[in-house]
């Protein structure tokens, strides 16, 4: 939205322009050596991001798919945990024009024996696809328990809520952001990330320039 560097961050800080330019040059050389000129901008950016995360020696990397998941370039990653957020009609020209077809692509990030966290409240046809994939790959399917959520306060700028007895604060408002946060909380539980780090991470999470 503001600059291309915002799409690659470590600890909330954008990749610097010099670092981006350096890695862009390295990826360009690798691309030229393949002799293939059909790589998309997102595929190039994904390669730059993965190389940057490797050089920065990150402990945990959050990798977001570009379109769908099944055929997405991010699917080269072997995840510690997979997260499927809200499935709705998006990129229908590529993913299909039914929720079941779109869900099939989204479920493409599910890997054998890797825990999969699913955004709560999905449509039944979406859940059928995801459930089947999780059973096929023998992976734990985790859906945040909305009955364990207690709303403490919500206004246009802040949300305070508790989940499973632990308090959290968001600066992104809306019920959907709470559900997104629950997915993040469950992912952090799988990764054994301590509560204080989860609380701070959620409190500092923001999407600049997404609302005016």
Where are the language model's segments positioned?
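ATP-dependent carboxylate-amine ligase catalytic core
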Residues: 1-77, 93-95
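Acidic, Mg2+-coordinating active-site environments of NTP-dependent enzymes
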Residues: 34, 56-64, 79-200
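Catalytic core of IPPT-family isopentenyl/dimethylallyl transferases
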Residues: 204-208
């Amino acid at each position: 939205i503001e600059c291309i560097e915002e799409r690659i961050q470590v600890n909330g800080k954008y990749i610097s322009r010099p670092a981006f330019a350096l890695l862009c040059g390295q990826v360009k050389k690798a691309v030229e050596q393949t002799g293939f000129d059909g790589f998309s901008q997102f595929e190039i950016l994904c390669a730059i991001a993965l190389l940057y995360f490797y050089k920065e020696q990150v402990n945990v990397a959050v990798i977001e798919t570009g379109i769908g998941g099944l055929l997405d370039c991010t699917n080269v990653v072997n995840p510690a945990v997979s997260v499927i957020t809200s499935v709705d009609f998006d990129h229908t020209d590529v993913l299909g024009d039914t929720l079941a077809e779109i869900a099939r692509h989204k479920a493409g990030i599910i890997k054998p024996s890797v825990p999969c966290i699913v955004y709560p409240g999905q449509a039944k046809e979406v859940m059928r696809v995801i459930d089947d994939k999780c059973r096929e790959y023998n992976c734990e399917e985790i859906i945040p328990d909305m009955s364990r959520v207690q709303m403490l306060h919500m206004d246009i700028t802040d949300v305070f809520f508790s989940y499973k007895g632990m308090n959290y604060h968001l600066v992104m408002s809306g019920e959907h952001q709470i559900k997104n946060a629950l997915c993040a909380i469950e992912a952090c539980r799988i990764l054994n990330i301590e509560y204080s780090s989860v609380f701070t991470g959620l409190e500092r999470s923001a999407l600049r320039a997404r609302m005016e």
